[in-house]
Amino acid sequence: MAIRGRGGDRGGGGRGGGGRGRGGAGGFRGRGGSRGGGSRGGARGASRGRGRGSSRGGARGGFGPRSSKFNDARLADKDEEEDEEEDISEEESNVSEDEIEESEEEDEEEDAQSGQPYMSLLKSFQSATKTKKRKLDHPEEEGPNKVTKTKDDDNSDDEDNEKVTEDVDAVDEPEEDPQDAPLEDLFDEDDDLDDSDPFETHFTAPDEATFQARIKAIQANKWRTDRIAKNSNRIYYNTPETGDSAEQKLPHSISGVGDLKLKQRLAESMAKHTEFDEAEKAVAPLLFNYQDMLYCNRSVASSESIRRMACLHALNHVFKTRDRVIKNNTKLQRDDTLELRDQGFTRPKVLMILPTRQSCVKMVEMICKVAAPEQQENRKRFDDGYVDKSTKFSDDKPEDFRDLFAGNDDDMFRLGMKFTRKTIKYFSQFYNSDIIFASPLGLRMAIGSEEEKKKLDYDFLSSIELVIVDQADALLMQNWEHVEFIFEHLNLQPRDAHGCDFSRVRSWYLDDQAKYFRQTVIFSAFNTPELAELQRLYCHNWAGKARLQAEYPGVIQYLGVKTRQTFSRFDAASIAADPDARFAYFTKAIVPTLVKRAAKDAAGTLIFIPSYLDFVRVRNYFANNPAVESVTFGNISEYADTPEASRARSHFLTGRHRVLLYTERAHHFRRYAIKGVKRVIFYGLPDNPIFYREIAGGYLQKSEQALMLEHGQGHVKVMFSKYDIMKLERIVGTKRAGKMITEQGDTFDFV
């Protein structure tokens, strides 16, 4: 079944889409699509990762059948265009951006399969003994890490010219039988039994009356919310409503390593890092007490601290889990009548969802710093497939852009990691791994497609106890449906036994309650409706959950240029009616002004459009509606290749195109320094407040410096509705945003 792209607008839309194309699995693709499908795991250029060129900004297509080029009815006639294109300077027409490949694919919905009840599964395991043998000898076409070869069209003009590539992340390793696995040494000899350790109270020996009462409240969707102000942060703390009227308090503050219940080995490796910084102090109490967390204050400056805390917590959890299993193995060798429940259905316990291979490299490097392994198996293979030390960007690119896209920016990867006392093993088979690193697309492809001649394989997610989603704001610009698909398939009861010793499986696994014990931690630069909904739908931790976000001063005061900013509010009856209400307001209140200016000089008007679906609607309006026939325009979306974008920028600079339509995802992936901007119209506000500062401030400032615009004569017009409150508060500030949504007036000016 084909897997849809983002559909432009994250909320859906009937059409697939996404800006970043990639070879797909069984017809499903990443952001932008695969050429004709291809088999699972394969991808063009997989051995080096995608890098730039075919990666960022997206492949065109993915929206059903379409013409090869958009026919713009408002452009000058063809002959004039050809003459003028010859005069375009090489500097303007080649803006140092690699070409983005084209792809097309139809979209289909896919329903996630639900887990079967445990007892029926157990009966099926007992009646089908062959299933158990699958762990030892996988056929080549089965398993999430299988070696896969893909026939991927390498030339859009010659579909017969195909190249076979091997998946750099493929693993040709059998699934171990836990009962036949070699004996392992303890990670350290410290005593795990500490009744005050959150690992004990949450997983190993939780109070049954307490967690059962809380699970019952969660199933009835009864949550208690307490808003807590702490420093400059707002903390929304949610706990299951069990009838306790006392105010729920956050976990005790943690100021350093000494306040944590760490394995001795980790405490020694972190001995020099005694004091936590502000970011670490903010996340540590919830993180190490196994509560769900949506942290919305991640920045480039705090990214290292966030990774350190995430990796320390993940390693602490893995080491405690493995040591408990190893110690109990020894006990059972002495007395096999003991009942020791210390594990789940499968071995993987931690899942890290990351946007790029470079993000994975940074997380792995932090794990190595904290764990300090004596040996690293397959490290060279990891470096060859993930590390890219080439310099791709100049220093004038924004810091957050370089942090995300420097290095290997391939967004299709998956990696299993296994720990022993002395060794870290990279590229371990998923069922033999302790930690799984993956991008949403990479993990989606590992799970498989219903169109493939095999069943979906997501049993390796059945016993995940810790999910860490880092740089979630970047994942929003990929195919968010893949993230939702992954969460839908977490902690389902497995369909195969995988050699599991059910006598050692914890009771809450057998009772299908694993999702209530899983901790989910999401790190993002800001909050969005998608992230809030992800936490609402998939975070059911019986210990509670919290959202942390800052009080925003607003970026309008940091534009770096004096300009008039007008915010106009329009009414929408519901969030579903918002797109139509927005378009109606635009055509009635904004377009007439553009038409009047066209008679004089409307050149230099940039219209920023966050949603691709809205972009298509506005573009078609400018191309076909007689009301704007006097307004020439160009457009740059995430699907525009480099020559198209170069022509649009050049024509806009020279004034041939008086209006330029520009999408948020095009800016996210390319960060074009567009020249000639005199006025900016925000059809909608960007999620990322940095984009507002760069476009409303940076573009106008460049025009003033180039003497194309008189000082202070630039103008910014913003359209917003009450459903834009999250975006609005980051732009104008938390205090102003509330007033702008509720006040009777609908126009607000800032200078």
Curated annotation (Swiss-Prot):
<dbReference type="InterPro" id="IPR053940">
    <property type="entry name" value="UTP25_NTPase-like"/>
</dbReference>
<feature type="compositionally biased region" description="Gly residues">
    <location>
        <begin position="10"/>
        <end position="44"/>
    </location>
</feature>
<comment type="subunit">
    <text>Component of the ribosomal small subunit (SSU) processome composed of at least 40 protein subunits and snoRNA U3.</text>
</comment>
<dbReference type="GO" id="GO:0034511">
    <property type="term" value="F:U3 snoRNA binding"/>
</dbReference>
<keyword id="KW-0539">Nucleus</keyword>
<dbReference type="GO" id="GO:0019843">
    <property type="term" value="F:rRNA binding"/>
</dbReference>
<feature type="compositionally biased region" description="Polar residues">
    <location>
        <begin position="113"/>
        <end position="129"/>
    </location>
</feature>
<feature type="compositionally biased region" description="Acidic residues">
    <location>
        <begin position="154"/>
        <end position="195"/>
    </location>
</feature>
<comment type="function">
    <text>DEAD-box RNA helicase-like protein required for pre-18S rRNA processing, specifically at sites A0, A1, and A2.</text>
</comment>
<keyword id="KW-0690">Ribosome biogenesis</keyword>
<protein>
    <recommendedName>
        <fullName>U3 small nucleolar RNA-associated protein 25</fullName>
    </recommendedName>
</protein>
<keyword id="KW-0687">Ribonucleoprotein</keyword>
<dbReference type="GO" id="GO:0005730">
    <property type="term" value="C:nucleolus"/>
</dbReference>
<feature type="compositionally biased region" description="Gly residues">
    <location>
        <begin position="54"/>
        <end position="64"/>
    </location>
</feature>
<dbReference type="Pfam" id="PF22916">
    <property type="entry name" value="UTP25_NTPase-like"/>
</dbReference>
<feature type="region of interest" description="Disordered">
    <location>
        <begin position="1"/>
        <end position="195"/>
    </location>
</feature>
<feature type="compositionally biased region" description="Acidic residues">
    <location>
        <begin position="78"/>
        <end position="112"/>
    </location>
</feature>
<dbReference type="InterPro" id="IPR010678">
    <property type="entry name" value="UTP25"/>
</dbReference>
<dbReference type="GO" id="GO:0000462">
    <property type="term" value="P:maturation of SSU-rRNA from tricistronic rRNA transcript (SSU-rRNA, 5.8S rRNA, LSU-rRNA)"/>
</dbReference>
<keyword id="KW-0698">rRNA processing</keyword>
<dbReference type="Pfam" id="PF06862">
    <property type="entry name" value="Utp25_C"/>
</dbReference>
<feature type="compositionally biased region" description="Basic and acidic residues">
    <location>
        <begin position="137"/>
        <end position="153"/>
    </location>
</feature>
<comment type="similarity">
    <text>Belongs to the UTP25 family.</text>
</comment>
<dbReference type="InterPro" id="IPR027417">
    <property type="entry name" value="P-loop_NTPase"/>
</dbReference>
<dbReference type="GO" id="GO:0032040">
    <property type="term" value="C:small-subunit processome"/>
</dbReference>
<dbReference type="InterPro" id="IPR053939">
    <property type="entry name" value="UTP25_C"/>
</dbReference>
